[in-house]
Swiss-Prot record:
InterPro entries for this protein: Enolpyruvate_Tfrase_dom, Enolpyruvate_Tfrase_sf, MurA_subfamily, RNA3'P_cycl/enolpyr_Trfase_a/b, UDP_GlcNAc_COvinyl_MurA
Protein name as annotated: UDP-N-acetylglucosamine 1-carboxyvinyltransferase
Lineage: Bacteria, Pseudomonadati, Pseudomonadota, Alphaproteobacteria, Rhodobacterales
Residues the record lists as binding phosphoenolpyruvate: K22, N23
Gene Ontology terms for molecular function: UDP-N-acetylglucosamine 1-carboxyvinyltransferase activity
Residues at the active site: C118
Residue sites binding UDP-N-acetyl-alpha-D-glucosamine per the record: R94, D309, I331
Amino acid sequence: MDSILVKGGGSLKGQIPIAGAKNACLALMPATLLSEEPLTLTNAPRLSDIRTMTQLLQSLGAEVTSLQDGKVLAMSCHGAINTRAEYDIVRKMRASNLVLGPLLAREGHAQVSLPGGCAIGARPMDIHTDGLSQMGAEIELKDGYLLAKAKGGRLKGAVIDFPFASVGATENIVMAASLAKGTTVINNAAREPEIVDLVECLRAMGAQIEGEGTSTISVQGVDRLGGTTHRVVTDRIELGTYMLAPAICGGQVELLGGRINLLAAFCDKLDAAGVTVTETENGLSVARANGDIRAVDVTTEPFPGFPTDLQAQMMALLCTAKGTSVLEEKIFENRFMHAPELIRMGADIEVHGGTATVKGVDRLKGAPVMATDLRASVSLILAGLAAEGETKVSRVYHLDRGYEHVVRKLSAVGAQIERIAE
């Protein structure tokens, strides 16, 4: 099992290209199930989760071809398809549940195993299945599979009130509603850029959707969708992660493809902490002078608030801030699993339920640490960049699910980092 070795102490300078959004691509790929015409995605990230979704779609009968070293995905799904998403594939990744809505909309029935992915909280499927049930689906759980069937063979439009703004459920229902009979209105819909990206793709395929980016989305179902070519939006979580690298180490780095409007709340917190973020012709420039990082309080919220997927990385920055910071995790429970590992590096952190109190220390010290999930793994790498001595991060297979070429990208701006096989 591979590890990553980081030697801290140096500042960073240069450019890092930001990939297409993993979370957008994982929703866009199942959209091919909604049409018999080709769907091509450009700017696709090269990640293990994308390969898992490729395997899943191929198992359902879709043709998926990876071009240009994985940056282009050419997909088509014509003729009869398989409607059973098997456990052996679905268990690898939670986003596998995004085939449920498209399969049900296209074929009128589906069998989808309950999913896997990072072990962060309960993340139940109820909000997905409740929404589909309101659209006329009969759904039962049997032997670990969700068995779904549309009454009369086709889903029907409905007014759906989500109890909370779920990204995955919004994506599933929007795709299902695109081919449903009548109009579907989703209240308390998620507003993330990845949902806007999905809707723009579906609209190019012929879907009639309004309200993306707001809390109310309206979908007028159509009889069929066509094909299109669509560019995947920039990955705002990869963007935020690499913005924190010069913030932690010092120096100046330009993030190619970045935009402030993807991460406005996050950029506000960086500014409050003493980090300079400016827009450039090609992206964002992030710089930290020799001054100290200031403590800031952070509360994770649905978009446009501070992203839960950047909480662990932000904690790494605040470990050496002047003063005391409080981080409140309001999206997922059990998402401070990185804190004990940061404490091994000398951080002063106390966790009580969904709140972590971080008292800044002068400097972290390198140590052997273990990644517990995707975002925790990269937070430990960031901490290692600024630590005194050498940090060895084990179980870095998590990284491959969400970051392409992390060692190459950080090395290119001056980080001392290498991946070692064990």
